Curated annotation (Swiss-Prot):
Organism: Danio rerio (Zebrafish)
Region (Disordered): 1-24
GO biological process, one term: angiogenesis
Gene3D superfamilies found in the cross-reference section: Protein tyrosine phosphatase superfamily
Disulfide bond positions: none
InterPro entries: Prot-tyrosine_phosphatase-like (IPR029021), PTP (IPR050561)
This protein's name: Paladin
Length: 860
């Protein structure tokens, strides 16, 4: 019966069009009949009641899924009522509490912390309003003469407006653990608007299950009288953000609304900058070619409280207004200048940035001016320095108890510094692209200037200021290389150094870090009657501190993570050598027993003799006059920076110009990853100088996923198709990799094969999945860089490589789309790249330099 009733034939469109009046009258009669209990029968089934009437023309079922939906319930504490939870987890909390309105503007303007920025620009900021409050804000702007208003809602978290008395008040879902904190990244890929629609339906369903009532929380400070009931009779009692902010367009034709979700800390993502630029392109009144006789539009920015994100929006708006009016507005007063003097200390990363940007100093000063004009409630630069001072004010003695506090202030300082960094970058983009009507999006422009990402990844250079007495005070320990570099190739007995090897038929050698004795043995070996190398270039690839103490090589490490090296990020060789000299002086001066970690055990040792690596090789030069020693720091698991390639090529060119038969020796801590990378680079370079050998045809590899073992990943093959003679470029790199790895099979380290090996481990090692995913991508990136470097050697050979690799990447490879490939780097054969942020240059390079070790130095 139920099935028959629900499947009753429907009137055709033609019949319905010609019988509207009859149908309406019949419906009213049928409805009246039902309510007068004149129905013939009411038949129920598991789906819903089926109502059949006398002389019926229509049969219908009521489908209501509310009772069947698996909604969850919960409570904040045992003495509070239990009720349904939004999205199965969250409580609905009144969005803005009264104390948040620091400027006390809700009563007068309708919005908390409503204000206009300085400089006379039509820029306004505020916190979250109610529906009625927003109408009052718009009326206030119209009263001030602003007919054209562009409003930006900067919130990424969902907000819904619930009907209460004569207004609709904003509420947001919050977690039980922190009722004060907004949700972030609630669902991957879901827009804020979609989430709000889902929440509205849930709230309506909850109310239907509870006599049209739902529980909300207004006082989360004391929870007195909470939760409170609010009446929801229909979905019309709930507004979403879009409904509140888009509808004024019908009464204000010159009004525009945009939702531009910004992060609560740190810099926005490139896509968010792109969305802002799209607004500039869409609105003629924000074009450089606008009608100058017309007033500038008012830009209104709003977040929750009207402080952090609103401040960022106001600064972006100020930069736009500066470009539109071609002025930096009025000069700062002497009093203001005096206040800002204390913050003229510049960070290294900012100095490097403005040093490379066109008109960098001017670009930065404009950003500083914009920050000053918008600093009534929040100052980004002030935030950096406040966090820096608090971070460095926490004493080393309280490291164990205070590590979380240090992490908190370090995170705050770096997030504010990143935001400041991106504002300078964005202003540089405006300088270049505003006159071009934004022919290039911000994300495209930034991708073509990938050196900016390199700088960003090295914001934290605190190790350059780490105290020299950390070891003598017990905060760090000395770890012997014998513990860090097992001699897998069994070469210590003969050569006195671990993992010594040679590229077959070439004068290229690699090894772990040698002692002074081992270095002397290696040099004697290279210059004997059999090999007869008259000159030797020795390159140390280490980017951490090293010392030879009591005839052993030691590195300072954190006592809880002795296997993790402490990189001196973005350091010049001179910086590392200076730190090593300070550490040596401290060790010799202390004359105390120190804990050291050896291969099998920990011991207490007194440091009686100590030398830096530079001193070791200076001494060796007295007996080997043709020895050249260079330190070129390479990262452990990834490709060298573009400048790293430059440095290695330059020193090889200079050496070969003097002696074409020179030996090239490379070492890192264990003779593995960095040494192998440098040996491959040297092999390719020498082949270009001396000619390529004949390569045998590819062997048929009978192993699972053989093409991935051979490096034929989709992103690699895209690069191969992009490069001139790309197949040959890859084939030559593969030959170099195979040649270098031929004598190191026991190390189980092949720069190409390790890519897929590492990726396969991700599923089996859940605890280290994120680290393995990063390593696999960095290995893949390193392989791609080797192919790019080989292409550079081919294409620039005619000019003897006068143009450095770093410049070639910027001038040639970047416009060709190489960095766009690297900005979508991933294993698209196995996964959706949208599911991983590590595919992006910004995230990957930042994560590469995050070591998670205790903060020991100072932000510089």
């Amino acid at each position: 019966m139920g099935t028959t009733a629900s499947a009753a034939p429907q009137a055709t469109l033609h019949e319905r069009l010609h019988s509207d009046s009859m149908t309406d009258s019949r419906r009213s009669i049928q409805t009246l009949g039902i309510h007068n209990n004149k129905a013939k029968s009411i038949i129920t089934n598991k789906v819903a009641p089926v109502v059949i009437t006398y002389n019926c023309r229509q049969e219908f079922q009521i489908h209501d899924d509310v009772l069947r939906t698996n909604y969850k319930v919960g409570r904040i504490s045992d003495n509070m009522p239990e009720h349904h939870l939004v999205q199965g987890s969250f409580f609905m909390v009144q969005d803005v509490f009264s104390k948040a309105d620091v400027l006390n503007t809700t009563a007068s303007y309708g919005a908390p912390n409503f204000r206009q920025s300085g400089g006379g620009f039509p820029l306004y900021g505020m916190g979250q309003t109610s529906l009625g409050g927003f109408k009052r804000v718009l009326e206030s702007l119209q009263t001030r003469g602003h007919q054209e208003v562009i409003f930006f809602c900067l919130r990424e978290e969902p907000v819904v407006f619930l009907h209460l008395q004569e207004d609709f008040l904003p509420y947001t879902p919050r977690r039980k653990e922190n009722l004060h904190e907004n949700l972030q990244h609630l669902q991957r890929g879901a827009s804020s608007e979609d989430l709000e629609l889902t929440i509205r339906k849930e709230l309506h369903d909850f109310a239907k299950l509870n006599d049209n009532m739902f529980y909300v929380y207004n006082d989360i400070e004391h929870l007195k009288g909470e939760p409170q009931k609010i009446c929801i009779c229909s979905e019309e009692d709930i507004h979403i953000t879009e409904e509140v902010y888009r509808r004024p367009r019908f009464t204000m034709p010159a009004y525009r609304y945009y939702r531009l979700p910004l992060p609560m800390e740190g810099a926005p993502m490139e896509e968010q900058f792109d969305a802002f630029v799209k607004v500039l392109r869409e609105n003629p009144s924000l074009s450089l070619n606008r009608d100058a006789s017309r007033l500038l539009p008012a830009l209104l920015f709003s977040c929750q409280v009207g402080v952090g994100r609103t401040n960022l929006g106001l600064i972006l708006g100020t930069l736009v207004m500066m470009h539109l009016t071609r002025t930096t507005a009025e000069k700062t007063t002497p009093a203001e200048e005096e206040v800002k003097d204390e913050h003229k200390i510049q960070f290294r990363v900012i100095e490097s940035l403005i040093g490379k940007l066109p008109k960098g100093q001017e670009v930065m000063e404009e950003v500083n001016r914009a920050i000053d004009l918008c600093s009534e409630m929040h100052d980004i630069r002030e935030s950096i320095y406040e966090n820096k001072q608090k971070l460095e004010g926490i004493g080393e003695d309280y490291q164990t108890q205070g590590s979380s506090t240090k992490d908190y202030f370090l995170h705050g300082a770096l997030q504010s510094l990143e935001r400041y960094f991106y504002l300078i970058v964005f202003n540089a983009y405006l300088h270049e692209q505003y006159p071009l009507a934004f022919a290039c999006s911000f994300s495209q422009w930034l991708c073509s200037n990938a050196w900016i990402y390199r700088l960003l990844s090295c914001m934290n250079q605190s190790e350059l200021r780490a105290p020299a007495d950390l070891v003598t005070k017990g905060a760090r320990v000395l770890v012997a290389d014998e513990y860090l570099a097992p001699d897998v190739l069994s070469t210590i007995k003969e050569m006195k150094v671990a993992n010594f090897r040679r590229v077959p038929k070439m004068s290229i050698y690699g090894m772990a870090q040698p002692t002074s004795e081992a270095a002397s043995v290696v040099l004697a070996y290279l210059c004997d009657e059999k090999r007869k190398h008259s000159s030797v270039l020795w390159v140390n690839l280490q980017d951490e501190l090293l010392l030879e103490a009591n005839n052993q090589i030691f590195s300072p490490r954190e006592p809880t993570r002795v296997e993790q090296c402490i990189r001196v990020c973005s350091a010049q060789p001179e910086d590392i050598q200076s730190l090593e000299a300070s550490l040596k002086a401290q060790l010799l001066a202390s004359q105390q027993w120190l804990e050291v970690t050896l291969e099998q055990e920990k011991q207490m040792k007194m440091i009686k003799s100590c030398s830096t690596v530079q001193e070791i090789f200076n001494q060796l030069k007295s007996s080997h006059h043709a020895l050249q020693y260079r330190r070129i720091p390479f990262p452990e698991c990834s490709a060298p920076s573009e400048e790293g390639f430059d440095q290695l090529l330059d020193v090889m060119k200079a050496t070969l110009a003097e002696d074409s038969l020179s030996a090239f020796v490379f070492n890192c801590s264990n003779g593995k990853a960095r040494t192998t990378t440098a040996m491959v680079i040297a092999t390719l370079t020498l082949w270009h100088f001396n000619g390529f050998p004949e390569f045998c045809e590819d062997e048929i590899v009978s192993v699972p996923d053989a093409k991935y073992t051979k490096g034929e990943f989709e992103v690699v093959m895209k690069l191969v198709r992009l490069l001139p003679d790309g197949q040959r470029m890859k084939r030559e790199v593969d030959a170099a990799l195979d040649s270098v790895s031929e004598t190191m099979t026991p190390l189980h380290y092949h720069l190409r094969e390790i890519i897929i090996c590492t990726y396969r481990q991700i599923r089996s090692c859940k605890s280290d999945a994120e680290l393995l995913a990063l390593q696999a991508l960095l290995y893949l990136e390193r392989y791609i860089y080797l192919i790019l470097y080989n292409s550079y050697l081919h294409l620039e050979k005619r000019d003897s490589w006068r143009r450095p690799f770093s410049v070639w990447m910027q001038q040639v490879a970047a416009p060709a789309g190489v960095y766009e490939l690297l900005n979508q780097l991933g294993f698209s054969e196995f996964e959706d790249l949208r599911d991983s942020t590590l595919c992006r240059l910004r995230r990957r390079w930042l994560q590469q330099n995050r070591h998670g070790l205790p903060f020991r130095g100072e932000l510089i």
